[in-house]
Amino acid sequence: MRKFFGTDGIRGKVGAGKMTPELALKLGWAAGRVLSRSGTKKVIIGKDTRISGYLFESAMEAGLSAAGLNVMLMGPMPTPAVAYLTRTFRAEAGVVISASHNPYYDNGIKFFSNDGSKLDDEVELEIERELDKPLTCVESHLLGKVSRIDDAPGRYIEYCKGNFPAEHTLHGLKIVVDCAHGATYHIAPSVFRELGAEVIAIGDKPDGLNINHEVGATSMGKIRETVIGENADLGIALDGDGDRIMMVNRHGKVIDGDEILYILAYDAQSRGVLRGGVVGTLMSNLGLDLALQELDIPFDRSNVGDRYVMTMMKEKGWRIGGENSGHILNLDHGTTGDGIVAGILVLAAMRRRNATLEELTENIKMLPQVLVNVRFEGAHNPLESEQVLAAKSEVEALLGERGRVLLRKSGTEPLIRVMVEGDVEADVIKHANYIADAVRNLV
């Protein structure tokens, strides 16, 4: 049974619960104890732009050093950059200090293994077992040293650009790039400019407190307004740590992760490089499933969370997968979700087919889907109550084969997520609220 790690590392409000300086220190030490048993004894740490990142960086650094591991600090860098540089520096692991799309007052800690993928569940459980032990320190001559990777941004910018075909440029495209005042603020605009695009950057002025605030992949109003107001060709919105992407076409319509998966799968199929099918999640829109069926591309669903998408992709030997929230995995172009690289791959598909973003998505029709989040912090599970199960069954009977209902607990926040999709938006909204009310009655 996990005490600390959720579906995406450890996350919570700074100074409360799990996310304290004391835990970060102990976590660094415990992880160092596990990771020092083999390998290079070298760990990379990156973070996003929230103000508490400095605090947790120092604590993790001290804990890892106390366990005898050398630490390399990247400063503010996107999560996928940590995964990439962990591989290229042959480090034993990478550490990301970020709460992704959450507000500034939250933070989190997650790990990458030496191949740039998320740590296995077994390794996380081993770290948790070490956390129960008293903290000790190696002999002074065995303490880890700390250094900085000063050229980390340049290394990652070149890596991102390398995913765009050399025979094409982005010359003539006007792109709005929303960095969510997060870890991509000094990376993403440069990547797309150097590939030839005219870039209008927003959300690129972090102050430690404004990460994800009314900007980024979870708040699309600003980028939609900017794309339309600037007469741009498209917009690319990233989240606070840069592992998620949402897009906007020239008319201001949001293009979500499901539609991006469709574009990438169709492009790979047309070039004869698609291996297998596409992995989505239980939250993926039924419209993606139906559109891929038209292309004879297999589709399967994993549990929600990019680590579970990755697990299913590896089991099936498939190369493309992701979530409608914008985590996009393409194992031919990286080991984890990468918002910038996913955007580059969509732009590459546009250039290869000489098509607009609207044209690339014209054959996928998304069904109306409503997600209602209900805050729930009780000890019992409302999803097992007769009242909620009865409401779910009632709605499923009304929707028939042209709709779905999904109820689940969030793995990162104290929320029950109620998702309903079907043909008629008004009915979908009504059904989702009906089930959500059944959950609220138990709070």
Swiss-Prot record:
SUPFAM superfamilies: Phosphoglucomutase, C-terminal domain, Phosphoglucomutase, first 3 domains. Binds 1 Mg(2+) ion per subunit. Mg(2+) binds at residues 100, 239, 241, 243. The active site is at 100 (phosphoserine intermediate). GO terms for molecular function: magnesium ion binding; phosphoglucosamine mutase activity; phosphomannomutase activity. Catalyzes the conversion of glucosamine-6-phosphate to glucosamine-1-phosphate. One of its GO terms (biological process) is UDP-N-acetylglucosamine biosynthetic process. The modification Phosphoserine is found at residue 100. Keywords: Isomerase, Magnesium, Metal-binding, Phosphoprotein. Its cofactor is Mg(2+). CDD domains: GlmM. GO terms for cellular component: cytosol. Belongs to the phosphohexose mutase family. NCBIfam families: glmM, PRK10887.1. The gene is glmM. Transmembrane segments: none annotated. InterPro entries: A-D-PHexomutase_a/b/a-I (IPR005844), A-D-PHexomutase_a/b/a-I/II/III (IPR016055), A-D-PHexomutase_a/b/a-II (IPR005845), A-D-PHexomutase_a/b/a-III (IPR005846), A-D-PHexomutase_C (IPR005843), A-D-PHexomutase_C_sf (IPR036900), A-D-PHexomutase_CS (IPR016066), Alpha-D-phosphohexomutase_SF (IPR005841). It catalyses: alpha-D-glucosamine 1-phosphate = D-glucosamine 6-phosphate. Its EC number is 5.4.2.10. It is an enzyme of class 5 (isomerase). This is Phosphoglucosamine mutase. It holds the Pfam family PGM_PMM_IV. It comes from the Bacteria. Activated by phosphorylation.
